[in-house]
Amino acid sequence: MKAENRIPRRRVLGLGVALAGLCAGCAVLPAGSTESAAGSQAASGGQAAGRVEKAPLEEIHNVHLRDNPELYEVYDDSGVVTMYLTVSRGNDSENTDHSWAEINHYSTYDYEAMGVPRYQVNALLQVGDENGPLPGELGYGVEAPNATVQIRGQSSSRNIQKNYKVKLKKNKGSWRGQRTIALNKHMGEGLRFRNKMAYDLIRGIDQMMGLRTQFVHLYVKDLTDRASGVFEDYGLYTQVEQLNKTALKAHGLNPEAQLYKVNFFEFYRYEGAIKLTSDPTYDQSSFESYLEIKGSSDHSKLIEMLEKLNDESQPMEKLLETYFDVENIAYWMAFQLLTGNADTQSRNVYLYSPQNSSVWYLLDWDNDGMLRRRERELIGFTDNESWERGISNYWGNVLFRRCLQTARYREALDAAVRELHDYLNADRIEEMTAHYRSITEQYIWQLPDVLQLPVTKPQYDVIAAALPEEIEENYQQYPEGYRSPMPFHIGVPSLQNGTLQLSWDPSYDFDAEDITYTVELARDYQFRQVLYREEYVVLPMTQTAAPGAGQYFIRVRATNASGYTQDAFDYYVIDTGKVYSVKCFYILPDGTVVEDLYEE
């Protein structure tokens, strides 16, 4: 982005620049020299040098996160890059003796069920234009494979159109300084440009760190089960820089840092999984079900932070000073709130902590869920509504809950929301949308992408035009979030002496208003066959006569003295989305109560 389109920078001179300025024209004394400052002054005629202005000395624990803006000026990422991928079989030792059909058949969940690592194939990656590979670009004139390729992603790995991770082999070159090329189809996202839009926006936000992105037109030639072939059109992808040690170094961060990709993590202690590698019971797969290790394997700093954070006797003001950067969390959260990127309360974010620092920072990751309210309305899918809108979306996360309960953090978040609201103005979003449409619509309305696009052309036009409006709606929703009670969890009912015991966690109100609950029990999730209903319940529990064996639904809502109502965290999943504030359970013939669970 142009400089005038950025949020004004509040930059501190780098240490190297400061030292260079101080040392210019100065004699450097050799180690162990006995020449004194006074002697040096005498040698210069007794005239004392003028006092120089120095940048104040900073502590490592007080450093704000800043990206390397010059990194984005090296390459033009505003258009489309054409990539050619020739895949072939490799060998058993490197897990590459597989077919391209196998790569595209199995999901991440299939590999977990089979207990095997993800299959790979050998690949030759070449970069060029629509006429073919170009001189001077990666892979030009090369015939032997220079990479491996496998599927990437979790839930997206079940899609017909896969995401791919292309990993260039050592000493086989790199593309824009990157050896891992992540290609994302964003198949469930109707516009196909939201993730790139997010990272392009983040470039202009000093308080956040982004990643390099590029639209890619991919062609694949499959030689895994045949001797010859042609390049087939795989449509439009978005390349997103892989967040690893190489990326940390490129962005001016510490490559020896602790870096975790959050798979599912709400900042609880998780004693059974989050352990030191020296612990005899340490299991990496269990650990990585919560946090995928991308940096240092020394987890002691992480454990120390989690133990302090989960000790409610520890003042959050002090913890924010010691273990977190308020600015970083506030701007990260403000961006997610304004863009409606709700699937960030327990995943789709990285944790980063520099070596020799106790501070943890949030790094943005995966934004294809942003600004999708209008799209979900048009396709008739219910998600990211109810408590998932606004600050209540983050209430189930220990870190975010304790932040929101702290006045200093709320003030910082208020300021960040206001500043980013001005930055994410309608003119900017409309201009960016027009640019992305001019690129992506060349590809998405033709094969192969048009077959899997979840929206029609008229719907696409409506969705794209509504993006600025969604930001404004989210901005207006933000202060409303503090007026409502916070969401809470419904407990699993229990049978005791012929009665059904119903319970839930207490709700929280920022103004400490009285809260009452409405409790309902029904045979259906639409609550047309209600068996029990009670309003103005004061305590987080009640009971009713035990029904017979069968499937049941409990719904609990909290209302404060001002009349604002909030749903419970629980929801029941149907084909068209979520039914909020509802828990499904079964009473078995032997009297056992079983909660209805499912995989997201």
Positions of PLM-derived features:
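Internal "kinase-insert"/substrate-recognition segments embedded within catalytic cores
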Residues: 170-172, 208-211, 227-334, 342
